């Protein structure tokens, strides 16, 4: 099977090409924070030769508690993302939570993301598809790798073929996620070898059964990222923070920002090795 390619400016997403990074922060806090984090990502990725799309959310609409920080909102958040693009000259990705937001988000974001918890919402899929933007489809935690094909088909039937598919872990009993490495190949085969992204930081989430926020296992981010890269990915999805313990959302899963360069150096070495080898197809 020939790997499908999705083009975003100078970035080519394909499972047999050098990986791209969808990297950034979980949620926008303010403009200075966004520029500081995005600037660091840009410097590191330029040194390592890794294509970058900066990720940040303007609204975390699915927080566990009504009191949790959600972000600056659609209008202010998109202004911050536009400032990041204009100042640093890098593409951006953000997630969309309602059909009404899709068109506005796609005017700023180069990639718009379908959240895992909302991935079966047909009205949202249709609205996102109709923007014509590149779409990153998060596989829901509650679906098998094969079932993501149904979401892909919805987008295609709505006229959008500019699709990335993203693994972010699967429910394992209550309050825990695991990543099934066999599922990567299943997703590729089921979806005609669309570019596959691995969301390594959200896959590290775990919950306190009585808590109102997600916990995480960021100490294992290197292990999980290396394992994922070994199967041949089009991209890695990563969230980092200058001080994860003070992050407004998902700090327990976030990579410390000062560890970004050594982390990506090791991840890139594995990707380079994997992509330098001939593909072995076993039926």
Swiss-Prot record:
Disulfide bond positions: none
Keywords, alphabetical: Cytoplasm, Lipopolysaccharide biosynthesis, Transferase
Pathway annotation from the record: Carbohydrate biosynthesis; 3-deoxy-D-manno-octulosonate biosynthesis; 3-deoxy-D-manno-octulosonate from D-ribulose 5-phosphate: step 2/3; Bacterial outer membrane biogenesis; lipopolysaccharide biosynthesis
Annotated GO MF terms: 3-deoxy-8-phosphooctulonate synthase activity
Documented EC number(s): 2.5.1.55
Chemical reaction(s) catalysed: D-arabinose 5-phosphate + phosphoenolpyruvate + H2O = 3-deoxy-alpha-D-manno-2-octulosonate-8-phosphate + phosphate
Pfam families to which the protein is assigned, alphabetical: DAHP_synth_1
Annotated GO CC locations: cytoplasm
Location of the protein in the cell: Cytoplasm
UniProt-listed GO biological process terms: keto-3-deoxy-D-manno-octulosonic acid biosynthetic process
Family: Belongs to the KdsA family.
Protein name in the entry: 2-dehydro-3-deoxyphosphooctonate aldolase
Organism per entry: Parasynechococcus marenigrum (strain WH8102)
């Amino acid at each position: 099977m020939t790997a499908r390619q999705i083009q975003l400016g100078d970035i080519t997403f394909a499972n047999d090409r050098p990986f791209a990074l969808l990297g950034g922060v979980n949620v926008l806090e303010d403009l200075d924070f966004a520029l500081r984090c995005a600037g660091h990502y840009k410097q590191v990725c330029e040194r390592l030769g890794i294509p970058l799309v900066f990720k940040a959310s303007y609204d975390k609409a699915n927080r566990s508690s009504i009191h949790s920080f959600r972000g600056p909102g659609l209008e202010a958040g998109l202004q911050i993302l536009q400032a990041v693009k204009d100042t640093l000259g890098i593409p951006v990705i953000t997630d969309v939570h309602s059909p009404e937001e899709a068109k506005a988000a796609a005017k700023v974001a180069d990639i718009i993301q379908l959240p895992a918890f909302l991935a079966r919402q047909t009205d949202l899929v249709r609205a996102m598809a109709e923007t014509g933007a590149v779409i990153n489809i998060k596989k829901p935690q509650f679906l098998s790798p094969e079932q993501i094909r149904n979401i892909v088909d919805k987008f295609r039937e709505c006229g959008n073929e500019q699709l990335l598919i993203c693994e972010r872990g699967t429910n394992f009993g209550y309050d825990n996620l695991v990543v099934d490495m066999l599922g990567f190949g299943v997703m590729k085969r089921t979806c005609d070898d669309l570019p596959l992204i691995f969301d390594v930081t959200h896959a590290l989430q775990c919950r306190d059964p009585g808590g109102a926020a997600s916990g995480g296992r960021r100490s294992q981010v290197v292990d999980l990222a290396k394992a994922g890269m070994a199967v041949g990915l089009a991209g890695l999805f990563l969230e980092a923070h200058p001080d994860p313990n003070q992050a407004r959302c998902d700090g327990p899963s976030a990579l410390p920002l000062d560890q970004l360069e050594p982390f990506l150096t090791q991840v890139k070495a594995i990707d380079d090795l994997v992509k330098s080898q001939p593909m072995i197809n076993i039926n």
